[in-house]
Amino acid sequence: MYQLKKLYNEELKAKLSEELGIKNPMLLPKLEKIVISVGAGDHAKDTKVMQNIADTISLIAGQKAVITIAKKSVAGFKMREGMPMGVKVTLRGNQMYNFLEKLISIALPRVKDFRGVPRNGFDGRGNYSFGLNEQLMFPEVVYDDIMVSHGMNITMVTTTNNDKEAFKMLELFGMPFAKGRVNG
């Protein structure tokens, strides 16, 4: 089931070592975790909608999502301390590779007019973030079960501090990047 993890351990480590010129296998870039988050925005006040968003993200990730809560009150955002603000889930290990495989091979190809994920999502420290406009591209999501169409932010945290190494690793995993060049 975890074909990407097997692929990384059996083939990609050797390719990365050769292409990046890293001889020590412990210094090779690895995927540490994937964080999926949703900002609820105007829907934060409705507990049923928040629970529906959490359930949807839990289905997509295969792991229970957590509703995030505001730590401070900010009048400009009409936000009070303790108010629900969004949903997040952190994936590690086999769940992480399972989600990445589903994202690359099933979800992203189902996006209409998809031209690749943007290359400018790297943060300068080897982590990659991008956003999706809706959740309907995932096979677990049933249209009739969702109350609100929402997007999500996906952040991939790697062990490297270099964007080019992280890009090379994600590219070898099969991440469909758009044409252009990488930051850094």
Curated annotation (Swiss-Prot):
Q: Which domain of life is it from?
A: Bacteria
- Any single GO BP term: translation
Alphabetic keyword roster: Ribonucleoprotein, Ribosomal protein, RNA-binding, rRNA-binding, tRNA-binding
GO molecular function list: rRNA binding; structural constituent of ribosome; tRNA binding
| Pfam families cross-referenced by the UniProt entry | Ribosomal_L5, Ribosomal_L5_C
Question: Per the record's keyword annotation, is tRNA-binding included, yes or no?
Answer: yes
Q: What does this protein do?
A: This is one of the proteins that bind and probably mediate the attachment of the 5S RNA into the large ribosomal subunit, where it forms part of the central protuberance. In the 70S ribosome it contacts protein S13 of the 30S subunit (bridge B1b), connecting the 2 subunits; this bridge is implicated in subunit movement. Contacts the P site tRNA; the 5S rRNA and some of its associated proteins might help stabilize positioning of ribosome-bound tRNAs.
- State how it assembles: Part of the 50S ribosomal subunit; part of the 5S rRNA/L5/L18/L25 subcomplex. Contacts the 5S rRNA and the P site tRNA. Forms a bridge to the 30S subunit in the 70S ribosome.
The entry's family comment says: Belongs to the universal ribosomal protein uL5 family.
Q: What PANTHER family does the entry give?
A: 60S RIBOSOMAL PROTEIN L11-RELATED (PTHR11994)
Query: What's the protein name?
Result: Large ribosomal subunit protein uL5
Q: What is the lineage of its organism?
A: Bacteria, Pseudomonadati, Campylobacterota, Epsilonproteobacteria, Campylobacterales
